[in-house]
Amino acid sequence: MEAKAIAKYVRMSPTKVGVVLDLIRGKNVNEAFAILKYTPRDAAEVISKVLKSAVANAENNHELDANRLFVAEAHVGHGPTLKRFRPMDHGKAFRINKRTSNITLVVKERA
């Protein structure tokens, strides 16, 4: 059995989120929380919330044991990009892309 949690439209670049997701993919849930706690990146805090939600979904909706869970899938997708313009010299404008991410975590119980 598996449980899933999704965070949509997180105001963070998918590239930066993906680096942190690579650290926890395949790990035990307790080990993943420990890794995220000491990872000095902003994405770690958001991913920790999503992981906590996935564990809660597993316990409450599927009645799985939290101590036997591991991160089966962890991936990030591109959300909509907010486009902003920065004024430059000589009347030019420079486009700034503020990227968003859709984070998906799936936890399963070890056999």
Curated annotation (Swiss-Prot):
It comes from the Bacteria. CDD domains: Ribosomal_L22. Keywords: Ribonucleoprotein, Ribosomal protein, RNA-binding, rRNA-binding. GO terms for biological process: translation. SUPFAM superfamilies: Ribosomal protein L22. GO terms for cellular component: cytosolic large ribosomal subunit. It holds the Pfam family Ribosomal_L22. GO terms for molecular function: rRNA binding; structural constituent of ribosome. Belongs to the universal ribosomal protein uL22 family. This protein binds specifically to 23S rRNA; its binding is stimulated by other ribosomal proteins, e.g. L4, L17, and L20. It is important during the early stages of 50S assembly. It makes multiple contacts with different domains of the 23S rRNA in the assembled 50S subunit and ribosome. The globular domain of the protein is located near the polypeptide exit tunnel on the outside of the subunit, while an extended beta-hairpin is found that lines the wall of the exit tunnel in the center of the 70S ribosome. Part of the 50S ribosomal subunit. HAMAP family: Ribosomal_uL22_B. This is Large ribosomal subunit protein uL22. It comes from Clostridium perfringens (strain 13 / Type A).
